[in-house]
C-alpha cells in the first residue's frame, strides 16, 4: 500500500501501523500525524477517498471527524476562560439567561464541558432538519428540563454539547463557534480544520463509509431497553449518511461535524501538548493548559456505558493512582486525538472508513501505541 508524506526514522513504527491498517482493509483512506516537542515528526496519508477506491487520498484531503470536533470546541472555551471572559464555575444562565428555564438556573459551565448537565438528548424528537438549524436547537435546549440533577453524574452529550458550549461562546463574543475557531485558532496556526465547511473546501472532503448499522448509538437501540443512553441517541437522531449531505457539511455542529485531517488536529493540539504555545503562537497560559489535566468528574457514563474521568472537556485515564499528564478524545467511527504533556506529544488519526466505536478504536490505538513506543525507546 502506497503511503505518502514524511516520517522521521525514529517513528517508522507509526508508518508501519498505518500501512497495516490499509493493507488488511481496516482502513480505506486515512491520515496520521504526530508532533513531538513542538516539531512535526509524522505527517502521513494513504488509501482512497471513496469506498470504490477510485480516488487517492491527497495531502489536503479533509473528512468529518465526528466527536474529535469536541476537542476543538474545548480549546475555544479554554481560550475564553484564559482571557477572563468565561468562568467555568459560573452558572450558564449568567451568559445565556433563557437557559435558566425548567430547573437549570444552577447548571454550571463546567457541567456542559463535562457531560454532567443532564442534557444529553431532547424530549422532542428531532433529526437533521432541526440539528442543522442553530436557533431551533438552542431554543429547544434552553427550554429542556435536565434528565438528572446536573453535576451528580455523567452521560455523554454526543450531539447537544456543541450547541450548549457554542451558544455560551456566542453570547460572550457575538461570534459562532465556527467563526471564533476559524479566526482565533485555525488561522493563527495555519490549520486545515473547519466547523462548517467553506465552499472552497467542499471538493476536498472525503466520503465517509458508514459502519454496518449507521445509526449513532446502534448498540444501545439493539438492547431495546429504555434508558438515558437510548433517549440520548434517539434525539437528536443522527445517521452516518447525514454526513454526505451539504446541509451537514455547511452547518455548525461543534460536537460532531468538524472536518479536517490528522495534520491539522495534531498541529492544533500541539498547543496543549506544549503548555499553551506552539511554533511561537501562544493561545493559552501555561496554567490554563495544565488545568485540562485536572479531573473534574468521574464515574459511570450512562450514555457510553463505561467508567470515565473528565478534565475540562477532555477524557483522562480513569485510574486513581494515575499521574500521567495525558488527555484524549475521539470520534464516532474511529478518529482520535491524544495529548501528552509529559512527553510534549500530540497524536492524531483521521480516516473515512467508520467502525462502530464512539470514541476511537483499535486502529488509532495501534498508531498511538507506536508513537509512544518511539518516544520512550
Give the label of every model feature segment.
Residues 253, 274, 278, 288, ...:
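Short, gly/Ser/Thr-rich active-site loops of penicillin-recognizing serine hydrolases
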Residues 2-65, 87:
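Short, conserved catalytic-motif segment at the N-terminal edge
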Residues 58-60, 144-151, 161-163, 245-254:
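Flexible glycine/proline-enriched surface loops and loop-helix/loop-strand junctions
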Residues 59, 64-68, 82-124, 142-143, ...:
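Active-site helix/loop module of the DD-peptidase/beta-lactamase fold
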Residues 12, 18-19, 38, 62-89, ...:
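Active-site SXXK
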Residues 115, 161-168, 252, 256-278, ...:
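Active-site-proximal alpha-helical segments within enzyme catalytic domains
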Residues 206-262, 290-343:
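Active-site Gly/Thr loop motif
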Residues 41-44, 127-149, 175-192, 236-241:
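Short, charged, amphipathic alpha-helices and their helix-cap/turn boundaries
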